[in-house]
Amino acid sequence: MQHHPLPEYPRPALRRDSYENLNGLWQYAITGSAGLPAKWDGDILVPYSPETKASGVGRTLQPGAWLHYHRSFVPPAGTGGRVLLHFGAVDYACAVQVNGHLVGGHRGGYWPFALDITDALNPAGHDRLWVAVQDPTGTGVQARGKQTLRPSGMFYPAQSGIWQTVWLERVPENYITELTVTPDYDARTVTVKAHTSLPGGAANLWAVVRAGGVTIAEDWGSDVADRDGAVTLHIPEEHFFPWSPDSPFLYDLTVGTTQGEEEQRDTVHSYFALRKWSCAPDAHGIMRFCLNGKPILLNGLLDQGYWPEGLYTPPNDGAVVRELQTIKELGFNLLRKHAKIEPQRWYYHCDKLGLIVWQDMVNGGGPYKLWFVTYLTNVFQPLLRRLPDARPLWGLLGRETEAGREEYARELEATVKALQCHPCVGCWVPFNEGWGQFDAAGAVEAVRRLDDTRLVDEASGWYDQGGGDVDSLHNYFYPLRVRPRSRVVALSEYGGIAWPMPGHEPPRRAYGYGTAKSRAELTARWKKLQLETVLPQLKKGLSALVYTQVSDVEDEVNGLFTYDRTAIKPDPAAVRAVNQALEAAFEKIVE
């Protein structure tokens, strides 16, 4: 493992020229108190969690314990302005000191944050950074996904602390903190709103759109009541290139403030796409997902986003790109990002490659009564999948406390705001199989207030309240019978055929949904499932497929890839042929 991992710019949708990556070897200690440790336990390779092999530590942070980090650093070159310290994600709660001064903190293990550390910097240099972290894992109500201190089956080892890139940048006194970019496919426009750091600061904007390096639109903005600037740019018809899996065209966008001397202005670089999601009846009156006004078969995989050496954190950017490219080459156009939020670069690569993403809200809440939430409901799914998620069930579903419900509302908003800049995200999934679920109808309303340009899968699997755009089925055990409904039908989990491939690290206890004994048997069962069970349901309204899953994960050996991503388990040619057959059948059906 390299000593300076993941050096790439971590935020492609809001880029500046100033960039100083702080990944690498830091000192660490795990103690029982929040105070600075008297001594350090050794080195940790950031941004890998201490639980991972890649970190060089291999220790689990227990609830109540403190994980401390320390390193020295040099601020980005230049003078004046402000220096910002960025964290891609820290799980779960942290406090940050620079040169002994508390500069801020953060709560929430999946979302980026930045701290202005300018006033704490040492004029003579020799700056030092301390980070103290706590992670309650399963003892809290926070989003945690599939992390557990007792991993088995479909739940995986917990990870904690810094797990995404840490970096510095120098910005002007009044800088752009975020962009809200709203493309309008029908009007062929893009509206750009910049939020700036100082109340009453410069709000006038300049923006330019380029297509293939050619400037196609530019405009000025004006002050608005809240002192944030906005511009709307029109895309000429001859440069109208809709985004789709077959043609994932991205427009380049540059935005700058215009007031003050040149060194006082801020300039950022971004991108966007023109595309439109909707639901509409096909030629036979059956509801379908539509991209840019045309019915589309969403054919994809469940993606947990775990890696054997780094858990949540990939070994390098190239490994991420290779995996996504291979998925696309196999004929898939969809990934359901399951119970995890990825680093921004992952979505950037999906934007560029044309892979559609259905994004889960990361599940949290109190302990789940799995005997009820998962096992009983699954066995009796035909009877229970539409069970109301009303207050009497909140205790069983892990949302009995007001604090847990408030935490979910904050997490939902943070997720949408963090990812809505990515064209690849086509659907929000507020809840999965009842884990931490409550008031799904209210969650759909909250999502649509934040973003009304995407689909919403209200409740993936069961505890379906009848809202959102998707009738979302999970089916591993029953005969598949689909019928047309008022919402579009998606088979959002199925398959999961297990096969521990020889020559790869064996699981402690193999987990999956049926087991093959060889590559040939796995391939044959995959083909039979897709062509004899799934394909006939397309004409009855089935419009999205999410096979479980991309790769093996810990004890789960039901992936198409091995855990280390070095091999595809079924015959790749057969997978491509099956996906081509599904696509051809769908196109014929919706004609």
Report residues per predicted region.
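Substrate-binding/catalytic cleft of secreted carbohydrate-active enzymes
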Residues: 334-579, 585-590
